[in-house]
Structure formats: structure tokens, C-alpha cells
Amino acid sequence: MDLSLIQGMSLPLYFLLTLFFFFFATAKTRRSSSTGTLPPGPPILPLVGNIFQLGFNPHRSLAAFSKTYGPIMSLKLGRLTAVVISSPEAAKEALRTHDHVMSARTFNDALRAFDHHKHSIVWIPPSARWRFLKKTITKYLLSPQNLDAIQSLRMRKVEELVSLVNEFRERGEAIDLARASFVTSFNIISNALFSVDLATYDSNSSSYEFHNTVVHLTDIAGIPNVGDYFQYMRFLDLQGTRKKAVLCIEKLFRVFQEFIDARLAKRFSRTEKEPKEASSIDMLDSLLDLTQQNEAELTMNDLKHLLLDVFVAGTDTNSSTMEWAMTELFRSTEKMVKAQSEIRQVIGQNGFVQESDIPSLPYLQAIVKETLRLHPAAPLIPRKSESDVQIMGFLVPKNTQVVVNVWAIGRDASVWENPMKFEPERFLLRETDVKGRDFELIPFGSGRRMCPGISMALKTMHMVLASLLYSFDWKLQNGVVPGNIDMSETFGLTLHKAKSLCAVPVKKPTISSSY
């Protein structure tokens, strides 16, 4: 997400002076056009525009600006024009009414590593190629039929998470909840793709490097790079993000190639009398079938980029959301007790949470929605206008970076009562979902570029949170009190807690007859 590159932007004075003299002759203002007027916005500094006004948490800075300049405003980010949307009405107009011209995306320089921006389903513009990739990932991983087929896999990985947490309970130790949840989500993906675990909570394990590389790549994609705002400087890679991304992707592609080679060797050694068992076919098998068709639309290179997309996009959202949910519940212990009571009453004393139980847990569902309202994993939704368009009466020129501030919409007092308070009860009284139809709550986006993995993400979020609340009581470590929990954020591709939530699991009480 391009705006994530703003965080930490701090350039030496000599470099600013060099840029100033290099671009001064071509610097432009933004306020008017022969075909319309841009939205209002904060004053622009020479050359750099509004970059330094956004700070380390641009979602917060943009939300503050919107209180002065309105629900649609414009900024100058170096050489780029950006339009920021901060209301459900403007978001609906951009993502639904004008979806046909707002479905492209800007991307940062790190994503140019290995030409990922030319192969990624996340970043390539809408086209026949993009539709083919979306159809492929839906058909072989994210369709309702496939999600049902790997239900037992999800259950098994959640049970392994509960077993891991129980080991910490027996030792009386605190567990890093985000990391534990990340491992669960990661291994659901790796088993659906390769039929193996590729993540572990143990940092000494050989598989730790792979999942740590994915995490590192996600972080790199949120590091600022001057080349995104001054394209003439792109080749310098001043922050070194492209070089670091190349190293990460190279490692991941090497692992992917090992799996591909091993699978192909197994296929070649199989005789005609030894057909593939249906139960042993994973997504890699299905994708390899596509690469071996006559006039195949999917090459081996495409396959590796698609696998990269699935790992990067399919794991971080769940762990971040789960960590924020548990954090908010620790800060409102009566709500944690209420959720545990609901879950334990439905499941009973010695059962296991099943996916089929989730519809019977409305308060749990409300907690997930409220967490996504206050702490959307992706606080800013990026788009790019492919032609001139009018939104809320203002001009959005062709090739403008359009950003929907989901974080600001979720905390808008004109939309939500007591918007800064964690109140899951609000969703027991209103019919609002997170699937892109209700624009006051769009953590997964909306329109044709909405996250295709939303169903899988929601299934995993609910199962992980329900299982942790059902199986254990919880306390904070080292005498930390709820009111002193660090709520600071780290802005990037996803919105993480700056300080991980570590908590001590406690044996749950025996359910009384009053349940």
C-alpha cells in the first residue's frame, strides 16, 4: 500500500536540497483543472507536498485532516496526486458506483522485485489476465467447495493451537498470542498448498526461517521509498527496500521450487497403475496440472508468484485481528466473561468448538466485527483512477492514487455512537456485515478488488478466537493491569500492535449448572 511508505520518512538535508533543485523547475500545484476542481486539502510544501505532514501513522493523520477538509480531500505526495476518502457515502461512490474506473492499484517499489507487480493478483490492473488469476485461486482454494473440503484441516490446526497453549498453561508461562495465531493461519495455508507445516512457534526449528521470511517481506513492503514519490529517483533504491525484497522473494521462490521439483519427480515416478488418490491432491497438484496443459495460461513463474500472494495475503490479517480482539477483551474483562459464557453454554463442558457452532454465537461474531471496526488489518484501501471521474462533485483525475481510509470510517462519530469505545453489543442491534455491502464497515474492501479470501479469513478468525476463549481463562503477565496495556500501532501493509500481547492461559473452571 503506497501510503504505508510514508511512515518513518526522514531524509538527510543534503538529499532534500538535491531533490529541490532537481525538480523545482517542474513542480506543479494541484488546485484546479480545466475539467473540474480537485477536493480541498491541507497546504502543500514545495516539492515534497504533504509527505512529512502524515508522520508514522498516516491513517490517523488523514483522519484528523478529514475533520478539517471533509470526507474527500486531496494531497500531494511528492510528484503524486492522492485523493483520500473518509466517509461511507464517498466510499460507496468510489468503490461501487465507479468501481469500473477505480479497480486498479498503485504499488510501492519493493513490489517490483522479481517483477512481482506484473504477476501478482493483488497488484496487476483489471484485465483478462487478472480475471484468470482470480478465477484460478478461487477455483482451487477459495471456493465454497474447497473451503468445505479443508474444514477438517482448519479444525486440526486449531486443535494444535489449543494443545500448544495448554503446554504454556501447564508451565504457567505467557504465550505471544499473535505469533501463535500466525502459526495456525500459516500452517492452514501451507497444508492446503503443499500438505506440510511450514511454520512453528519454536524459533529453533528449521521451518521457522520460511515463515519468518514471509513476515519480513510483509514488513519490507511497508518501508518508505523515495522512488514511489519521485519516479526519477527510483533506480537509486535509496532505502534499499527493493534489494531486501529481492532477497526475501528469492528465498521463498527457492522453497517453492523445491516443492515443485519434488512433486514433479513424484509424478514422473508414478506408473499408470498408480493414479493419484483424490485425498492426496492439494492446490499445488491442481496448479501444476494447469502449467502442463497445451498452451497453458499459467507458467511456472506465474505459479510461484501466485503462491507468494497466497502466503503474504492469507496469514497476517488473522493474527493481527485475533491479537487486537484479545487486547480489547482484556481491557473490558466483563465482555470477555460474557463471550466465554456464551461459548461454553453452547459447547458444553468437554467439547470442542466446531465451525457449525459459530452461527449460534452472536456475541462472538459481534466481537469480531467490533474488532475489525476499530482495528482493520488494512487501514487504508488503495485504488487508482484509470480515467477522470467525479466523486462527491469533485474531480479525481486519471492516474490519481485514491485511498479509502477504512480506519477513519470505523471511528466516525456521525456513523457510530461512542465510536472510540469497544462495544460489541452495537452489532447485536444492527444488521451490518463485513462483506463489502455496508460501507460503514469494509475491512476487506468492496467491489471487484475486495479481498477474495474473506470467507476463509472469517472462518479462521472465529474458530481461533472461540477456541481460545472456550478452552482457557486468561490473565495478563507480570502484574500488568488492563488499563496499562500498550495500544500503540505499527503502520504497514497491516496494522499491528507495536508491542505484542503476551498472556498467561489459566485452566477454565468447571461449568456450573447455571450455564
Swiss-Prot record:
The protein's enzyme class: oxidoreductase
Pfam families referenced in this protein's UniProt entry, alphabetically: p450
UniProt-recorded Gene Ontology molecular function terms: heme binding; iron ion binding; monooxygenase activity; oxidoreductase activity, acting on paired donors, with incorporation or reduction of molecular oxygen
The keyword Metal-binding belongs to this UniProt entry's keyword annotation: yes
Binding site for heme: 451
Gene Ontology CC entries for this record: membrane
Recorded topology in the membrane: Single-pass membrane protein
Spans through the membrane: 5-25
Major subcellular site: membrane
Domain of life: Eukaryota
Keywords per UniProt: Heme, Iron, Membrane, Metal-binding, Monooxygenase, Oxidoreductase, Transmembrane, Transmembrane helix
Protein location: Membrane
EC numbers, comma separated: 1.14.-.-
Keyword Ribosomal protein part of the UniProt annotation: no
Cofactor(s) required, per the database record: heme
Family: Belongs to the cytochrome P450 family.
Name assigned to this protein: Cytochrome P450 76C3
Gene name of the record: CYP76C3
